[in-house]
Amino acid sequence: MNRWLKILIALIVVIAIGLIAAGLYFYNYAVVPGKKDFINENTPGSKVVQTPEGAWFKDDKNRQEWSITSEDGLRLKAIYLPADKKSNRTVIMAHGYMGSAETMSVFAKMYHDWGYNVLAPDARGHGKSQGDYIGFGWPDRKDYVQWIEKVLTENGQQEQITLYGVSMGAATVMMTSGEKLPDNVKAIVEDCGYST
């Protein structure tokens, strides 16, 4: 084998190893759940802010924990807050990147004040839900179809459902809109999807 061919093969191997290492680094940096040093502390939906709404969300006496098992076997958790007066309207919320149900407290309180039942799930790999990677809405869309089914099972077939998402959660509800949804889903609100 001539010398230049050996150098070329060695160069290709080094470049391939470098690309694989870079890919693994960036996968772990962005997709694996955990503390992210690149997230600005003011990024909407990425941290729990001490507000009156946050205290209400955490301490509401009617707060319930709901759970489902995803199609791929993950245990997913959510916080359910029934409306103060019996209501057949439920909003299902979707938080942003590295957020959790609690980071949606301001929006949860707003919908609750409007007379909605509120369901705030932790996306896979976030909060109390299981998951080894962040799906950026794609696998989560199927989870939200299951959350819709859970609301209908728990609250009845007369329920009118709104999906509301912020940032990555907005991407989630947009992707959910492409699935076969029951007629009970009356509105889908995406707040700043893909802008962050």
Model-derived features with residue positions:
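A short loop-to-beta-strand scaffold at the N-terminal edge of the catalytic core in hydrolase folds
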Residues: 71-82
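Short beta-strand element of the alpha/beta-hydrolase
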Residues: 88-96
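N-terminal Sec-pathway targeting helices
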Residues: 1-17
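Primarily recognizes the serine-hydrolase "nucleophile elbow" in alpha/beta-hydrolase
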Residues: 150-154, 159-196
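Alpha/beta-hydrolase active-site loop
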Residues: 134-155
